[in-house]
């Protein structure tokens, strides 16, 4: 594997990028979530890129406009379609052996791919998609709150805290009110993601870290019977544990290998 730092242009603005090159004809385009730089939190995306490239698949990471090494205004994930499309063109130009590209994003990066109907990618790995509107809080969905309270009721220490007055009753009342709802309210963001993904003709998988609030809210707002959903038990949002990281890497490699034989 060789690592190359480079730049490409998106609507007249210079954007920073990194290629972990490999001989494979299927590549991974890694889109950053939130306002993270392309290396990711604690260098996690750089590490993932090196691991995937080590398995024979080139990986292209980039900073969208206004983030990290890139010029311009940060317009957020909802308006990042052109950034993704420009990165895809740059990837194909710098690694001409690449015939098919799998797009991967976590959190709102996966939402961006869904809203953009893949933005030109041939297949998608969509991890913990963000469906929370700007004016909403990111509290757990009703089902997760009910599960948490059920566990507390089994714990004698928690019951003692309740009867001894050590529990904030106002906070408890708010939690019970949330828990009593049948499901989280839908969002226009989730509907837009659903419509965008429906227009995507390639393979797509949806990966959910079961310990992640973002994933829990997504489940409440998505079709529970969607066969594309795969779950990683106990994993957090960033797949921090070695077991979760191995699971994530395995799912990505599986889809990359499936594209290679098409």
Residues of each region from the PLM?
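N-terminal cap/lid segment of alpha/beta-hydrolase-fold proteins
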Residues: 1-26, 241-242
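Short, surface-exposed "cap/lid" segments of acyl-processing enzymes
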Residues: 21-63
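Alpha/beta-hydrolase
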Residues: 31-32, 64, 127, 232
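Alpha/beta-hydrolase active-site loop signature
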Residues: 35, 63-68, 131, 236
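Aromatic pocket-lining residues of Rossmann-like dinucleotide-binding sites
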Residues: 52, 116-117
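Catalytic nucleophile-loop/oxyanion-hole region of alpha/beta-hydrolase
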Residues: 65-95, 100
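Glycine-rich nucleophile elbow surrounding the catalytic serine of serine-hydrolase chemistry
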Residues: 103-115
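The alpha/beta-hydrolase serine catalytic core
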Residues: 120-249, 255, 262
